[in-house]
Amino acid sequence: MKQICSIVLLGAAVVSLVSAAGSDSEISFEYHRYEELRKALVSVWLQCPTIARIYTIGESFEGRELLVLEMSDNPGTHEPGEPEFKYIANMHGNEAVGRELLIYLAQYLCNQYQQGNETIIDLIHSTRIHLMPSMNPDGFEKAASQPGEIKDWFVGRSNAQGVDLNRNFPDLDRIIYTNEREGGANNHLLQNMKKAVDENTKLAPETKAVIHWIMEIPFVLSANLHGGDVVANYPYDETRTGSTHEYSASPDDVIFKSLAKAFSIYNPVMSDPQRPPCRKHDDDSSFKDGITNGGAWYSVPGGMQDFNYLSSNCFEITLELSCDKFPNEDTLKTYWEQNRNSLVNYIEQVHRGVKGYVRDLQGNPIFNATISVEGIDHDITTAKDGDYWRLLRQGNYKVAASAPGYLTVIKKVAVPHSPATRVDFELESLMERKEEEREELMDWWKMMSETLNF
């Protein structure tokens, strides 16, 4: 990851933004082309420099930076015990509403933080938030360059190479479905990730950059913002049998449905049971309460949503936010008002389930320890500081921590709706246990020798 110095990023333009940031902090409800997007993010950073940071995870095929605005009380650092959250928008370049909403969200969080909104202050102090307004800046520029207000349904969807980025990720669904039948790992399905990604010539540069990002930061929760319908979509996206439409539950189907509803319930259009389909012949039969299982709607191989879940600890859903992919500019404020509360509430879901640390008996963190939940065939692993976050719905669970060379520890946990329950584990190494057993045996032998006068 490369942090962007604003002076290098925008040159002389920064000077004018410095003076404007204090007097005119509102971002107007309009579309932001690439240069305008950069300026908008820098404006947020200038207004809230203590809680904001701009960085890039790489470049698009045409050389545009894949920009991220981070918001945290300690930007630039993973704080042990603090969960990481991300929003990604504009993966399809012609699906533009999500791109603008993340710009508005950044400004909103900054404004509310400065105005003393306790909910937002607590959220930023307890969460490291990453906002990527555009994963496909090349596609957006192509879509936005079309004349007139009505944009073509497909122009700009793919990246500059013609690659559909939401069909371009390694297809881990096929691996997990094989493992379900024949036995095998249920998480982190790509070994030697960096090499496998770098050597895969079929992956677009935008896809590679996001994969490395997912592998570098221990994200817990994410959402991928799209357009073309109005629904919150959850894994699995790809069907088990190859059927076009088939409910494809993941092991975490219960919490995924709850996460999707956490977004849809605050969006009055998405949650409206009387909402007509976006188009006359659309099949919305799988939509209920504004949510749908991905496979039940239509099967998507190589999607980013399932890749997050199967390659890392990150749970991701896909948010379809508008019937029109590139609606008229005068509707953007309405879309913001419809989605503002949903966007904030969904971030708060990162503080559900159980969290804590896995350490050895000397207090040293155990990296890559496995956290398992009885009855859920999907494990997560600890980060470098031994910290972990396991999203769960309210209920009673048996949670286990294990690691090679250590004895497994199992704990019973009562999990409320929120906040997350703190559950720490101390694991005893097998070497220590063997040493204890050897010492106990020697003590017993000594006692027996003295008793029998050997």
Swiss-Prot record:
Cited CDD domains: M14_CPE (cd03865), Peptidase_M14NE-CP-C_like (cd11308)
Primary location class: membrane
Superkingdom: Eukaryota
InterPro entries noted in UniProt: CarboxyPept-like_regulatory, M14_CPE_CPD, Peptidase_M14, Peptidase_M14_domain
Cofactor comment: Binds 1 zinc ion per subunit.
Reactions this protein catalyses: Release of C-terminal arginine or lysine residues from polypeptides
GO cellular component, one term: transport vesicle membrane
Protein localization: Cytoplasmic vesicle, Secretory vesicle membrane; Secreted
Entry EC number(s): 3.4.17.10
Function: Removes residual C-terminal Arg or Lys remaining after initial endoprotease cleavage during prohormone processing.
Record-given protein name: Carboxypeptidase E
Organism encoding this protein: Lophius americanus (American angler)
Gene encoding the protein: cpe
